[in-house]
């Protein structure tokens, strides 16, 4: 085989702990990695590594199906989803399955179907994983050259990258098709308090879509997390799907340019580090999205956002005290600022009190009361609808603050309900996962770069305690 790489640059492409580079085997002697190093033993065994990945996919899909059915079995239609600790059914409801006006669940059968489909898929994946891990060929290069690869083969690696991008693009278009043609998706902004609707007028203007990417991440700007209508979200998926598919075709048809060949380290561990870095960014972005965004993650299913619960509390007490005769336009609070209403730094009328820091919240139950200059005093006096009062009282008592033992809600709110919001769970878990994936990115990037430079020898294992212990088998 012709040499695909410069020996000087890529000698020891993989960092082996004991310096041997024998191909076969899954033991420490032949691979340089002990059993607990997992897939590192399979760096050069493409067939076995395929088995590990397919089995891993099976475990993921099995969890999704089993947890889905568990949530269906425990679901009480009379209670909101966010009070029941559900993290999967809200995603299905957001996609428009099983829900009607106001986010009310009218049919749980689609949720059951989703769980069963995932379980069946996981069985297929599990079988494939076991087959390739135990029975299939150790390496794919000889029998199935299309599926085989050498980590150093840059052209093959970018072809694999291209295939992945095309699959991601297809995934983005599946959401577009669901929103446009297959029943629509749940829109929390639909008049009267949310409903499932088909998206008709997609936002495809590049200045609007890519404008989100160029926005500041701070305050009311909020980067891509500030998206607040479904036309923009689905239109963004059209753009994203197109870019992924076109980029995938590009990477399949082309070879890496000279600058790319020089800039990147071309080894299995380097690709692992790139992937972990990307997933870390996904995790941090998802964390911010689920915490702040009530359009992609409707409050009817996930509970209110923190700012939303806070503004709901101010609104609820404004409604109460106005009924008791308070003049909410002029009442003064203990600090000399308005007790119920005040002005923002830019002059809009906003809720007063501690919730002033959340003045740029937008929520479907509040927007009808705004005028051209912030909250409209006339509407607040004459136009508040019962559904707005009910919803804000509900959100006030379900703030997404809570510890693991379910002591939830605002500490000073005597009506707060003991629960932990799915927003808390999803934001926290994605932040923690994003953080650890970032650490993994740094670790594997460091090892891959050192290996490429030729000075990473790994840990000296000659005197490691485990070597003097009885083998497990």
From Swiss-Prot:
| Gene Ontology cellular component terms for the protein in this record | photosystem II; plastid membrane; thylakoid membrane
Q: Which residues hold [CaMn4O5] cluster?
A: 367
- Cofactor annotation remark: Binds multiple chlorophylls and provides some of the ligands for the Ca-4Mn-5O cluster of the oxygen-evolving complex. It may also provide a ligand for a Cl- that is required for oxygen evolution. PSII binds additional chlorophylls, carotenoids and specific lipids.
Organism domain of life: Eukaryota
Give the record's keywords alphabetically.
Acetylation, Chlorophyll, Chromophore, Manganese, Membrane, Metal-binding, Phosphoprotein, Photosynthesis, Photosystem II, Plastid, Transmembrane, Transmembrane helix
Q: Name one GO molecular function term.
A: electron transporter, transferring electrons within the cyclic electron transport pathway of photosynthesis activity
- Record-annotated membrane-spanning stretches: 69-93, 134-155, 178-200, 255-275, 291-312, 447-471
User: Which InterPro entries did the record assign?
Assistant: PS_antenna-like, PS_II_antenna-like_sf, PSII_PsbC, PSII_PsbC_sf
Biological function:
One of the components of the core complex of photosystem II (PSII). It binds chlorophyll and helps catalyze the primary light-induced photochemical processes of PSII. PSII is a light-driven water:plastoquinone oxidoreductase, using light energy to abstract electrons from H(2)O, generating O(2) and a proton gradient subsequently used for ATP formation.
Protein name listed in UniProt: Photosystem II CP43 reaction center protein
């Amino acid at each position: 085989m012709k040499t695909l790489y410069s020996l000087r640059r890529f000698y020891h492409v993989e960092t082996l702990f004991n310096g041997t580079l024998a191909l076969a085997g899954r033991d420490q002697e032949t691979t340089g990695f002990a059993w607990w190093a997992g897939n590192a033993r399979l760096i050069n065994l493409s067939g076995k590594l395929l088995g590990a990945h397919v089995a891993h996919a099976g475990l993921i899909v099995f969890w999704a199906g089993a947890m889905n059915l568990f949530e269906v079995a425990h679901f009480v239609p009379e209670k909101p989803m966010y009070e029941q600790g559900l993290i999967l059914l809200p995603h299905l409801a957001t996609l428009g399955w099983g829900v009607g006006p106001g986010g009310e669940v009218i049919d749980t059968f689609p949720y059951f179907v989703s769980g069963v489909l995932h379980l069946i898929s996981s069985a297929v994946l599990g079988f494939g994983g076991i087959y390739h891990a135990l029975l299939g060929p150790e390496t794919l290069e000889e029998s199935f050259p299309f599926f085989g690869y050498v980590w150093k083969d840059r052209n093959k690696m970018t072809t694999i990258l291209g295939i992945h991008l095309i699959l991601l693009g297809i995934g983005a278009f599946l959401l577009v098709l669901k929103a446009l043609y297959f029943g629509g998706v749940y829109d929390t902004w639909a008049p009267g308090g949310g409903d499932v609707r088909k998206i008709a007028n997609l936002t495809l203007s590049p200045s609007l879509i890519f404008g989100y990417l160029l926005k500041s991440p701070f305050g009311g700007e909020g980067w891509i997390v500030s998206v607040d209508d479904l036309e923009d979200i689905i239109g963004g998926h059209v753009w994203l799907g197109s870019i992924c598919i076109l980029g995938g075709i590009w990477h399949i048809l082309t070879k890496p340019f000279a600058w790319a060949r020089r800039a990147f380290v071309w080894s299995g561990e380097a690709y692992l580090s790139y992937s972990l870095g990307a997933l870390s960014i996904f995790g941090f972005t998802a964390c911010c999205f689920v915490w702040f965004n009530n359009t992609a993650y409707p409050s009817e299913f996930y509970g209110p956002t923190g700012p939303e619960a806070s503004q709901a509390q101010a609104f609820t007490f404004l409604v109460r005290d106005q009924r008791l005769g308070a003049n909410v336009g002029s009442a003064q609070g203990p600090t000399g600022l308005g007790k119920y209403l005040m002005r923002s730094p830019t002059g809009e009328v906003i809720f007063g009190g501690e919730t002033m820091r959340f003045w740029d919240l937008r929520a479907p139950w509040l927007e009808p009361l705004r005028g051209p200059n912030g909250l409209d005093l006339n509407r607040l006096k004459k136009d508040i609808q019962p559904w707005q009062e009910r919803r804000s009282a509900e959100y006030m008592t379900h703030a997404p603050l809570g510890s693991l033992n379910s002591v939830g809600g605002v500490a000073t709110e005597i009506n707060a309900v003991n629960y932990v919001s799915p927003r808390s769970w999803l934001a926290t878990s994605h932040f923690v996962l994003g953080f650890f994936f970032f650490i993994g990115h740094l670790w594997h990037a460091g090892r891959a770069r050192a290996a490429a430079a030729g000075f990473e020898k790994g840990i000296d294992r000659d005197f490691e305690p485990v070597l003097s212990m009885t083998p497990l088998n």
